[in-house]
Swiss-Prot record:
Annotated protein name in UniProt: A disintegrin and metalloproteinase with thrombospondin motifs 1
Domain comment, as recorded: The spacer domain and the TSP type-1 domains are important for a tight interaction with the extracellular matrix. The conserved cysteine present in the cysteine-switch motif binds the catalytic zinc ion, thus inhibiting the enzyme. The dissociation of the cysteine from the zinc ion upon the activation-peptide release activates the enzyme.
Short name of any one Pfam family annotated for the protein: ADAMTS_CR_2
Propeptide stretch(es), residue numbers: 50-252
Gene symbol of the encoding locus: ADAMTS1
Species assigned in the record: Homo sapiens
Length: 967
C-alpha cells in the first residue's frame, strides 16, 4: 500500500479561528465508513497513508461509569459540547483467542520469555450512543477511557489526560474516578473523505505467489490463473450482489467458515514507541481489520483471529528490518517460519504472519510504501506474510488491504476487475487510491469474486480448522482508547497535537506541525477514530457524528440466511454436454453488524444439451478451443507460417487437466492459453469426467454429472460387454524395414499394442509405427522415431503413445475408431526378435440358431479363456435365451441350443529335455559334470523355462565325477 498525500500534507496555518482556516489545495474528504465498520473508521482518523482532512472541537470531560445491574452492560456518561452523551456498552473482544500467547523476544536478559498475561479481554467494549441505532462506539475502559464513537455524522475521540489514566484505572464500574486527576480530552469532528494510493501495477493477470508491493514502481501482484473464473461464466451472474460464496476443492461452491489464524509481530521500533500499551494497540488495529472481514460484501464467512503475539526488544533477535520494503518482507517471511509449529493442530500454529514496524518503508524509487505482502499465499507457511508500516490507527486499513492481497485480491483498478467493478474502482478496500469509501460495501465485487474463486479452487483449506485458543480482540471503539492528540502523535510524532476544526468534526483529523518555522495544521486525510466524542450523547462513527443511544440498531449482530434459488442460467455448450448453474444469495436477510454469513451450498450445477454435436471433421471440443487461438497467433516462432494450436494431453498434471493447454503443431512448444476450458469439456480423452469452473468433476458416459454409467469394453454406454469380441495376437519375428502387424477396423475400441524391450536395453531394434487409412504415417514413419510420450489426434480419437525409448513401448486408445488404421513394426539393424502383442474389441454379430422364427432367440457371448494351455483344455461361453428386448426368455428351441463348452489346446505341452553330460571338470581327482536343460515346444522350438511344468523339471543336471587319482 502506498501513501498519497496532497500538497503540503494538507497543511494550514494555525490561527485563532480554526473553524475558518482554509484547507490546503488538493485536500480531500473521506466519506463515512459503513456502520458495521464502527471500529475501522476510528482507526483511520490518523492516517498518513490514506489520509483525510477534518476539523474538530475538543473539551475536557469527566467520564461517569456505571455498571447496569443484571445486564452485563456498562453505561458511560459524558457532558460535553452542550449535550449529554450516554453510551451503552457491552463487552466485545471476539477477535481475541482465549489462550493466545504474547512473547517478548530479545529482552536485556537475552532470553525469550512470555510476559505475565494480563487479561485484556475485559478492556474492550462496543455499543451505541444516546440510543441512536446508527451510532456506534468502540472503547477500551482499561487505564482510563480510550477509543472512539460515532453519532449523527460526527466522530468523537476520547483519551485520558496523561496523569489521569492511572487514577482512572483504579475506579470500579459505577464508582466515580478520584479527583482531581479525572479529566479526559474529548474531541469531535465531522465526516470527510479519504484519499490514498496503492501503486501496484495490475495491468496483467498475476501468477500466484508473486510478491506484491504497495509502491507503484516496485510491485507486481500475482494470482493463480487456475483459480480464476471467466467473467463470461454463468456462475458469475449476480457477482456484486449479496451472494453467499466460499468453498473448498472437495466441496464445490460451498460457503464454509474460514478462520485466519494470525501471528502479530512488533519490532523494536514498535516496542520503544508504544511501550506498555503495545499489545493493546496491536489488538485494536487487528480488531478493525477483523470487523472489515466480517462485512457481507466480501461474500464469504471469514474470521481473523490472533493466536500469537511476538514483541521484539532486541533487533538482533528478530528479522532484519530496513527501509527496503521488499527485502524486509523476504527477511520476515524467512524468519517467521521458525515460530510456526508445523502441525495445524497446535494451538500456536498460524496461517499468516504480520510484522508491524515504525520503520519508514521504501519502494524502488519512493518511500511512500505503507505495506507489502505476498499474493495468493494464505496457506503457504513460507510466504503467507505481510509487512505493515505503523503510521497510526489507520494502519488497520493497511492490514486489511495487505491481507486482501494474501487472499489473492488485486487492486480494484486492475484489468481483471474492469468487467466486475465498472467505473466504481476507488471506493472499496482494495482501491489503489482510496477515496470516499463505500460504507455499505467496503469490498468491491471484484474482491469478493477473487477471494471466492481463490477459496473455491482449494487454496484455503488450511483455514478450515477452528482455532483452539484465539486471543480475544478488544470490543471497545479505538477512539475510546486513543484521543485525537494521541492519534496525532501516532501519525506525526510525539510533539504533534490535535488542531480543532469544527468544519471537519469526525471526518478529518488535523494535527499540529511546523513548516518553515511556522506552526501549521496538517492532515493525512483520515477521519477521527470511531468512538471519539462529538457532542453530548454523540460520538464519531464512520466519519459521522451520531447519537450513542441507538447502539442496538447497529451493534446487535444479525445473522444472514439463504434466499431462494434463482433460475437456471444458460448452458455453456449448445451440444455435446454443457453445464448450467443456479445460485442463491445470502440476502434473507443479509447479515449485518458482524452477524454470521450464510454457510452451505451457494451454487448448483447440472448437465445440459446432451445431444451429439454435428461432426466437425472429427475434431474434439478441446481441439476447437485450441484452434480458436490460431487467429491470435499471427506472429510465428522464428519463421514460417503462423502457429496452429492443438491440445496437449501427455505430461499434463491431473490438477491442470481443466486448463486449456495447447501445443504448437510441428514445433512442440506448449502454453496455457486459457486458465479454464469451457464448462463441459471432457477432462481427458479417456475420461467421461468433465470440467466445471476449472475443476474436474465426475460424470457418466451419458454426459450427465454424477451419473454412474460407464462405457463397457465394447464402447457401449451402460453396456455389459456382450456386444463385442476380443481380437488378440502377437508377433515374434520380423524382417528389416516396415511390416504390417494388423489393420484395426473402424469401430474398434480399447486398443492396446505393446512391445517390451529386453532388460537393460532401451530398445530391441524394433519399433511400433502407425499408418493411416490413406497410407500416410501418423507415427514413426520415414525412419524417424518419436522418443517421448505423446498424444496423437486421429479423426477425433486420441492415440496415446509411450515413446520409442520407454521400457514398455505402447499404443493405447479407448474410444471407437472413426477410420481404420494399420499397426506396423519397424525393424532396423541386427534387431532381436520382437515381442509384440495386440488386443482390441470389435462389434460382433448376434447369432441365431432357431429353425423356426420365434420372438426369442439363443444369444451367445464370446468364448472364455481355455482352461489349459496344452494337452486338451476346455472353453466355456454363456448361452442365453432372450426375447427381442434382450430380456431372459424360455421359448427358445432346446434342440438347437448352441454348445456352451468346447475342447481347446489339444496340442502337447512343452517338455523338458536333458542334454548329454559334459566332461568332468577335473582331469584327476573328484570334480563335477553337468548337462544342459531345455524347455521344448511340441514342434521343437526352444521356450523359456517358465513354459514347462516346474513340477516335472529334472533335478539331476549336475553331478559329481571321479577321475583317476592325481599323482
Amino acid at each position: 500500500m502506498q501513501r498519497a498525500v496532497p500538497e503540503g500534507f494538507g497543511r494550514r496555518k494555525l490561527g485563532s479561528d480554526m473553524g475558518n482556516a482554509e484547507r490546503a489545495p488538493g485536500s480531500r474528504s473521506f466519506g463515512p465508513v459503513p456502520t458495521l465498520l464502527l471500529l475501522a473508521a476510528a482507526l483511520l482518523a490518523v492516517s498518513d497513508a490514506l489520509g483525510r482532512p477534518s476539523e474538530e472541537d475538543e473539551e475536557l470531560v469527566v467520564p461517569e461509569l456505571e455498571r447496569a445491574p443484571g445486564h452485563g452492560t456498562t453505561r458511560l456518561r459524558l457532558h460535553a459540547f452542550d449535550q449529554q452523551l450516554d453510551l451503552e456498552l457491552r463487552p466485545d473482544s471476539s477477535f481475541l483467542a482465549p489462550g493466545f500467547t504474547l512473547q517478548n523476544v530479545g529482552r536485556k536478559s537475552g532470553s525469550e520469555t512470555p510476559l505475565p498475561e494480563t487479561d485484556l479481554a475485559h478492556c474492550f467494549y462496543s455499543g451505541t450512543v444516546n440510543g441512536d441505532p446508527s451510532s456506534a462506539a468502540a472503547l477500551s475502559l482499561c487505564e482510563g477511557v480510550r477509543g472512539a464513537f460515532y453519532l449523527l455524522g460526527e466522530a468523537y475521540f476520547i483519551q485520558p489526560l496523561p496523569a489521569a489514566s492511572e487514577r482512572l484505572a483504579t475506579a470500579a464500574p459505577g464508582e466515580k474516578p478520584p479527583a482531581p486527576l479525572q479529566f479526559h480530552l474529548l474531541r469531535r469532528n465531522r465526516q470527510g473523505d479519504v484519499g490514498g494510493t496503492c501503486g501496484v501495477v495490475d495491468d496483467e493477470p498475476r501468477p500466484t505467489g508473486k510478491a506484491e508491493t504497495e509502491d507503484e514502481d516496485e510491485g507486481t501482484e500475482g494470482e493463480d490463473e487456475g483459480a480464476q473464473w471467466s467473467p463470461q461464466d454463468p456462475a458469475l451472474q449476480g457477482v456484486g450482489q449479496p451472494t453467499g460464496t466460499g468453498s473448498i476443492r472437495k466441496k464445490r461452491f460451498v460457503s464454509s467458515h474460514r478462520y485466519v489464524e494470525t501471528m502479530l509481530v512488533a519490532d523494536q521500533s514498535m516496542a520503544e514507541f508504544h511501550g506498555s500499551g503495545l499489545k493493546h494497540y496491536l489488538l485494536t488495529l487487528f480488531s478493525v481489520a477483523a470487523r472489515l472481514y466480517k462485512h457481507p460484501s466480501i461474500r464469504n464467512s471469514v474470521s481473523l483471529v490472533v493466536v500469537k503475539i511476538l514483541v521484539i526488544h532486541d533487533e538482533q533477535k528478530g528479522p532484519e528490518v530496513t527501509s527496503n520494503a521488499a527485502l524486509t518482507l523476504r527477511n520476515f517471511c524467512n524468519w517467521q517460519k521458525q515460530h510456526n509449529p508445523p502441525s495445524d493442530r497446535d494451538a500456536e500454529h498460524y496461517d499468516t504472519a504480520i510484522l508491524f514496524t515504525r520503520q519508514d518503508l521504501c519502494g524502488s524509487q519512493t518511500c511512500d510504501t505503507l505495506g507489502m505482502a505476498d499474493v495468493g499465499t494464505v496457506c503457504d507457511p513460507s510466504r503467507s506474510c505481510s509487512v505493515i508500516e505503523d503510521d497510526g490507527l489507520q494502519a488497520a486499513f493497511t492490514t486489511a488491504h495487505e491481507l486482501g492481497h494474501v487472499f489473492n485480491m488485486p487492486h480494484d483498478d486492475a484489468k481483471q476487475c474492469a468487467s466486475l467493478n465498472g467505473v466504481n474502482q476507488d471506493s472499496h478496500m482494495m482501491a489503489s487510491m482510496l477515496s470516499n469509501l463505500d460504507h455499505s460495501q467496503p469490498w468491491s465485487p471484484c474482491s469478493a469474486y477473487m477471494i471466492t474463486s481463490f477459496l473455491d479452487n482449494g487454496h484455503g483449506e488450511c483455514l478450515m480448522d477452528k482455532p483452539q485458543n484465539p486471543i480475544q480482540l478488544p470490543g471497545d471503539l479505538p477512539g475510546t482508547s486513543y484521543d485525537a492528540n494521541r492519534q496525532c502523535q501516532f501519525t506525526f510524532g510525539e510533539d504533534s497535537k490535535h488542531c480543532p476544526d469544527a468544519a471537519s468534526t469526525c471526518s478529518t483529523l488535523w494535527c499540529t506541525g511546523t513548516s518553515g518555522g511556522v506552526l501549521v495544521c496538517q492532515t493525512k486525510h483520515f477521519p477521527w477514530a470511531d468512538g471519539t466524542s462529538c457532542g453530548e450523547g454523540k460520538w464519531c462513527i464512520n466519519g459521522k457524528c451520531v447519537n450513542k443511544t441507538d447502539r442496538k440498531h447497529f451493534d446487535t449482530p444479525f445473522h444472514g440466511s439463504w434466499g431462494m434459488w434463482g433460475p437456471w442460467g444458460d448452458c455453456s455448450r449448445t451440444c455435446g454436454g454443457g453445464v448450467q448453474y443456479t445460485m442463491r444469495e445470502c440476502d434473507n436477510p443479509v447479515p449485518k453488524n458482524g452477524g454470521k454469513y450464510c454457510e452451505g451450498k451457494r451454487v448448483r450445477y447440472r448437465s445440459c444439451n446432451l445431444e451429439d454435436c454435428p461432426d466437425n471433421n472429427g475434431k474434439t471440443f478441446r481441439e476447437e478451443q485450441c484452434e480458436a487461438h490460431n487467429e491470435f497467433s499471427k506472429a510465428s516462432f522464428g519463421s514460417g507460417p503462423a502457429v496452429e494450436w492443438i491440445p496437449k494431453y501427455a505430461g499434463v498434471s491431473p490438477k491442470d487437466r481443466c486448463k486449456l493447454i495447447c501445443q504448437a503443431k510441428g514445433i512442440g512448444y506448449f502454453f496455457v492459453l486459457q486458465p479454464k476450458v469451457v464448462d463441459g469439456t471432457p477432462c481427458s480423452p479417456d475420461s467421461t469426467s468433465v470440467c466445471v469452473q476449472g475443476q474436474c468433476v465426475k460424470a457418466g458416459c451419458d454426459r450427465i454429472i454424477d451419473s454412474k454409467k460407464k462405457f463397457d469394453k465394447c464402447g457401449v454406454c451402460g453396456g455389459n460387454g456382450s456386444t463385442c469380441k476380443k481380437i488378440s495376437g502377437s508377433v515374434t519375428s520380423a524382417k528389416p524395414g516396415y511390416h504390417d502387424i494388423i489393420t484395426i477396423p473402424t469401430g474398434a475400441t480399447n486398443i492396446e499394442v505393446k512391445q517390451r524391450n529386453q532388460r537393460g536395453s532401451r530398445n530391441n531394434g524394433s519399433f511400433l509405427a502407425i499408418k493411416a487409412a490413406d497410407g500416410t504415417y501418423i507415427l514413426n514413419g520415414d525412419y524417424t522415431l518419436s522418443t517421448l510420450e505423446q498424444d496423437i489426434m486421429y479423426k477425433g480419437v486420441v492415440l496415446r503413445y509411450s515413446g520409442s525409448s520407454a521400457a514398455l513401448e505402447r499404443i493405447r486408445s479407448f474410444s471407437p475408431l472413426k477410420e481404420p488404421l494399420t499397426i506396423q513394426v519397424l525393424t532396423v539393424g541386427n534387431a532381436l526378435r520382437p515381442k509384440i502383442k495386440y488386443t482390441y474389441f470389435v462389434k460382433k454379430k448376434k447369432e441365431s440358431f432357431n429353425a423356426i422364427p420365434t420372438f426369442s432367440a439363443w444369444v451367445i457371448e464370446e468364448w472364455g479363456e481355455c482352461s489349459k494351455s496344452c494337452e486338451l483344455g476346455w472353453q466355456r461361453r454363456l448361452v442365453e435365451c432372450r426375447d427381442i428386448n434382450g430380456q431372459p426368455a424360455s421359448e427358445c428351441a432346446k434342440e438347437v441350443k448352441p454348445a456352451s463348452t468346447r475342447p481347446c489346446a489339444d496340442h502337447p505341452c512343452p517338455q523338458w529335455q536333458l542334454g548329454e553330460w559334459s566332461s568332468c571338470s577335473k582331469t584327476c581327482g573328484k570334480g563335477y559334470k553337468k548337462r544342459s536343460l531345455k524347455c521344448l515346444s511340441h514342434d521343437g522350438g526352444v521356450l523359456s523355462h517358465e513354459s514347462c511344468d516346474p513340477l516335472k523339471k529334472p533335478k539331476h543336471f549336475i553331478d559329481f565325477c571321479t577321475m583317476a587319482e592325481c599323482s
